[in-house]
Structure formats: C-alpha cells, structure tokens
C-alpha cells in the first residue's frame, strides 16, 4: 500500500445481523420500539466501535426485515454516522443540532421522524392522516390535504376558487372576443354607393382609419329642424348642408378617430405659440366641444392646449358658416388667443412646408404679383412668391394647370380685448373678423369704397392692415363680457361668395346682426398687381385656443387656468341654386386631395418649414423661366 493510504477510512464489511429487534417497554410507548445499538466489524481489527443511537419508530405489527434488507439499511446508518450525531436525550429526535433544540419553530412530535432503515416497509399514508399543530398541510380536514387524500373535500373555499376562475375566464372571453365583435364597424373603406346621394356626390375619397359608429349623413341627427334653412346676406334662402352639434359625450379627436375632425399634435411655430397643441386637450362635454388651455410644463413649453382641424376631410366653397361659441377666459384681461377660422385646403395649418408659397395667395394672374417679394425692394413683401400660379411651365408639378392656386384665409373670429376708454381699469372683449390676401396692395391699403360697417358704435375697422407676410382686412367688434367661460354662448360666422370684383363678397356677423362686409373689388387691380379673389379654394375649418406674444402680451397673474373655449355647434348653409358652391375638398376645377396625397413628405412632417426642405422642387413658371405653359 502506498504511503498515506493507511490514514484513509476502511470500507466496512457487510455482516448478517439478527433481523428481530427488541423493544424497551419502559422507555417508549407500547406501540413503538426502543433504541437500536449495533456493532460494526471491520477486517483487520478486533475492536468494535458503537454506532450512534438512532430511534427506530416501528409499529409492533411491522413485518421483520430480511437479512439483506437490514444489512443494507445498517450500511446506510453507518454512512450517516460519519457526520455529527443529532439527537436529544429525551428521545425527541429532531434531526437538528442541539443548539436548535427548544426552538418553537423546530419542535416536532416524535412520530414525525423516520429512520432511513424503515423507508421500504412503513406505510406513509399516516403523514396526511395525522394532524400537525402548526402546519395545515398535515391537517386532514384542510383543503390542501384533501388533494392527497383518498376522499374528495369540496367546501366553500374550493367552491369560491372555482367560481372565481369561471368569472375570470368569462371576463377574458368577453373582453377579447365578444366586445371586439360587437364594436367592429365592418368595412372601414365602404364604397360610396352605400352612402346617401349627398355623401356619394360630395364627400372626398379620403380613407379613414378605424372609428366607432361613423355618420352616414352630413347633417347631425341632433340638429333641430328649425335650423335646416337660413336667409343669406343676399336675401336668398340657404339650405343646411353640414352640421355637428357635438352632443355625443367624450368624443376623441386623435388621428383617425373622427370622420370630419382631427386634433393635431404639434407646436404651432408659425406664430411662436407658447403652448403645445395636444389631442388630449380636446373632447366633448355637456353637449359642447371643449378646448382646454392648461398652464403646465409640456414638451419644453409652458402651456398645453388644442387645435381641431377639418383639413382634407371637410371643406366648403361658398355659403354661410355659423358657429355658436363661448370664448375662453374673460374679456376683462388680455392674453389668450381663441381662433375660429378657415384656410385653403392646399395649406395644412401648422405644417409650414405646405403653406410655403400658397398662403395667403388668392390670385390667378401671371404678373409681378407672383414673384418673390413682389419684385419690390421696399420690404413690402417677404413672401417667396406664388408657388402655383396660372402660368406654370408644361409638365410642372401643379394640381390644376392654368388656374392660379393658393391658400387664402378667412377668419370667423380671433379673440382679444381692448379698453373702451383709456382710463378704464378693465378691458372688454372684442373679436377681429378678417380676410388675409396676397399679393399686396401698395402699403397694404385696400379700396375702402368697397367696405361697409353696419354699426360703428360696436364695430370699427382695424388700424392694422398687414405686414410683409399678409395683407389683412379686419373689423373689430365689441362683445359682452358674459359671453365667456361657458356662461353664455354667441353666434359668430360669415357669409361669402367666391369670385373677383363685384362678383365676390364676404359678410361677417355676430349674433343675428352683420358687423361688416367687403366686396372683391376692395382688393381689385392696383398698379402692378392684378385683382385678388374672394377665395375660390375649398376651405377647411379650424378651432384653436392659443397663447402667444405675437398676438397679445399677457400678464400671468391676471389669467386663470385652465381656460376653456366651448363650441356648441357648427352649421354650414349653401344656396341650392349656386352651382359654384360646394361641400367637400375637391370642387370642380380646384382639386386638392390628389395633390396632397402625392406630397406626403410636406403634408405629414410639421418640422419641414419650406417646400424644398420637404424634398420637393419649386415649379417653374413662364414669367420667370421663359417656358411654354
């Protein structure tokens, strides 16, 4: 044997032992045996070493073990003896070190211990038929043990568990199967044949995203029949062609959620707004459309508000547009900028690449008026020129070659305040009702012979007539300070007829009274610039509530937030005998939707500020590039 091997423990030899065990009746209960003391014999040594005392909990009726089985169990006991003996002299064998004896956590009854030598013969069913004081698992009456027992135990606890699983499964099925099936609206791009005659003839081919219960008529079912007709500025009878009463509670105007309206998610950088327009700021409540301006930090801006547009969904050309509104805040303090206005559909509000070269052009001539800065060095115009004049070169990018196109603006109102007298402590509310035009008259001065103010005690012409980006004709009308904050509503709107010269006009009104009017001749031919038009373009509709120092300096301490502008309804009327009137974004001779679809990089990117930045080239024209048209 090599050196060092003698120190290793020797493998014991297996010996046959008496299979019959003796019981000490004085030490243990009558139903269990006593401690077992067995000697181990090893080859090469006559000495004996006692094995540790191990309690053998045997019942008297156990079948004696065969010698082979007993020898195997004794070998196992011998192997266990190499570790420190864990026992208690009080015969409560715990199987734990003595340092833990006496702990409440580790106390167990003596019948819970099994010697390894009895695993092959003891009936283990007593484990779950005996009650354990601190463990429900060993309580036969517990619902936990009933799963292992021979007889089922179905009590109220188990019944409640099963009932809960049933309800949970039913709820999941209703949520993910039944509810989607009930709310599915069917074909989201139905053919026009499925709509009524008005919808089939006048709605565009715009494809809408998923929406809940789309309308199949342009007239809201909640509009009273008494509002189906109205007398126009020209004395003719007009018919209702579109209405939205905003009576359905909790409408959402996120992209794709509504047929006619969409709330934008942009910063309106064109006017240096101090707020971010968020769709979450707009909803319907108590039968009104509510646009809420909040004063909190949002996307690196101090305010959050909303802008609702009908761009490329709902447009009008000619007729009367009427809105019932209660303006935000109070007429006593300046600072807020409520707006209800219309814009040519070729420009998407807030997307500056789309307004580049089209706002606020209402022009169909081929002269100096279409050139950058109107070819003038006096700073009268900073506009880049008309992008879509009537004289673009052959095969250039144009929605309707031969027709001058643009995006003029007509405002139903822009809210502000002013003092009736210089020494007044508080302001009073006013609205500006205006039209924006390009190219410009000399020093932006219109021909006042073609303007009319109907009551100069409450309405006067605005001294602001324009700047390098627009020519503005505006009338200022005094309001009642109760028409704010949802306390009372008032009607605002305009009646207009597209055209040049005396063929076109715009008349604004507040309540039942017209405030002021202009004929197209007010912006007729003037020097090097030809006649501008009362808009021939399909006009989209915009509601917004903003705050900007471009409009009015605000004193934060005088304003109250949140400020809410409420819209009760919007209604559009048109003369049934006027063939030039149209509801929709593609009137004859003035299409827009196809052109918009062909230029997605501009119309879907609010961060592009010029047409070239969006990746498109400026169309050439015969005046500047000497080409064929």
UniProtKB/Swiss-Prot annotation:
Pfam families: SKN1_KRE6_Sbg1. Keywords: Cell wall biogenesis/degradation, Endoplasmic reticulum, Glycoprotein, Membrane, Signal-anchor, Transmembrane, Transmembrane helix. InterPro entries: ConA-like_dom_sf, GH16, Skn1/Kre6/Sbg1. The keyword Ligase does not apply. It is found in: Endoplasmic reticulum membrane. The lineage of its organism: Eukaryota, Fungi, Dikarya, Ascomycota, Taphrinomycotina. Glycans are attached at residues 286, 373, 455, 480, 513, 607. It comes from Schizosaccharomyces pombe (strain 972 / ATCC 24843). This is Uncharacterized beta-glucan synthesis-associated protein C23H3.11c. Residues 1-161 are cytoplasmic. Belongs to the SKN1/KRE6 family. Residues 24-38 have a biased composition (Polar residues). Residues 231-578 form the GH16 domain. Residues 39-52 have a biased composition (Low complexity).
């Amino acid at each position: 044997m090599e050196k060092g091997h003698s120190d290793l423990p020797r493998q014991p030899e297996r010996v046959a032992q008496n299979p019959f065990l003796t019981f000490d009746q004085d030490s243990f209960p009558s139903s269990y045996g006593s401690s077992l003391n067995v000697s181990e014999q090893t080859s090469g040594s006559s000495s004996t070493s006692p094995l540790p005392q191990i309690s053998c909990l045997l019942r008297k009726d156990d079948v004696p073990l065969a010698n082979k089985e007993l020898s195997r169990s004794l070998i196992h006991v011998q192997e266990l003896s190499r570790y420190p003996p864990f026992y208690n002299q009080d015969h409560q064998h715990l199987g734990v070190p003595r340092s833990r004896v006496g702990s409440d956590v580790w106390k167990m009854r003596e019948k819970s211990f099994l010697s390894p030598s009895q695993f092959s013969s003891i009936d283990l069913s007593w484990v779950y038929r005996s009650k354990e004081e601190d463990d429900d698992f060993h309580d036969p009456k517990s619902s936990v043990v009933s799963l292992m027992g021979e007889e089922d135990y179905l009590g109220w606890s188990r019944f409640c568990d099963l009932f809960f699983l049933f309800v949970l499964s039913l709820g999941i099925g209703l949520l993910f199967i039944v509810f989607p099936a009930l709310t599915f609206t069917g074909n989201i791009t139905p053919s026009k044949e499925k709509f009524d005659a008005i919808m089939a003839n006048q709605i565009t081919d715009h494809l809408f995203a998923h929406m809940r219960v789309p309308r199949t008529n342009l007239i809201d079912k909640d509009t009273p029949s008494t509002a189906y007709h109205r007398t126009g500025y020209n004395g003719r009878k007009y018919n209702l062609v579109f209405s939205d009463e905003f009576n359905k509670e909790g409408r959402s105007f996120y992209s794709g959620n509504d047929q006619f309206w969409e709330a934008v998610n942009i910063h309106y950088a064109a006017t240096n707004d101090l707020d971010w327009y968020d769709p979450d700021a707009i909803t319907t409540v108590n039968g009104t459309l509510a646009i809420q301006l909040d004063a909190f930090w949002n996307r690196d801006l101090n305010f959050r508000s909303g802008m609702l547009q009908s761009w490329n969904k709902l447009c009008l050309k000619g007729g009367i547009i009427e809105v019932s509104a209660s303006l935000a805040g109070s007429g006593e303090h300046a600072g807020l900028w409520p707006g209800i206005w219309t814009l040519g559909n070729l420009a998407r509000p807030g997307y500056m690449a789309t307004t580049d070269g089209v706002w606020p052009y209402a022009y169909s001539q081929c002269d100096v008026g279409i050139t950058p800065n109107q070819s003038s060095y006096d700073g009268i115009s900073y506009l880049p020129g008309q992008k879509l004049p009537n004289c673009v070169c052959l095969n250039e990018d144009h929605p309707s070659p031969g027709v001058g196109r643009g995006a003029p603006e007509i405002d139903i109102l822009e809210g502000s305040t002013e003092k009736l007298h210089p020494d007044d402590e508080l302001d009073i509310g006013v609205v500006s009702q205006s039209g924006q035009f390009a190219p410009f008259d000399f020093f932006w001065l219109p021909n006042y012979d073609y303007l009319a103010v109907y009551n100069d005690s409450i309405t006067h012409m605005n001294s602001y007539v324009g700047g390098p980006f627009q020519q503005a004709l505006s009338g200022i009308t005094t309001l009642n300070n109760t028409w704010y904050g949802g306390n009372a509503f008032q009607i605002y709107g305009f009646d207009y007829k597209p055209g040049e010269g005396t063929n076109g006009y715009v008349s604004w009104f507040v309540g039942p009274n017209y405030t002021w009017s202009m004929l197209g001749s007010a912006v007729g031919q003037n020097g090097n610039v030809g006649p501008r038009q009362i808009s021939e373009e399909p006009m989209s509709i915009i509601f917004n509530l903003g705050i900007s120092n471009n409009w009015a300096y605000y004193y934060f301490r005088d304003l109250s937030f949140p400020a809410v502008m409420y819209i009760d309804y919007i209604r559009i009327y048109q003369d049934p005998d006027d063939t030039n009137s149209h509801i929709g974004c593609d009137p004859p001779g003035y299409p827009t939707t196809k052109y918009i679809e062909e230029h997605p990089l501009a119309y879907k990117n609010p961060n592009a500020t010029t047409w070239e930045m969006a990746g498109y080239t400026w169309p050439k024209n015969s005046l500047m590039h000497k080409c064929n048209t």
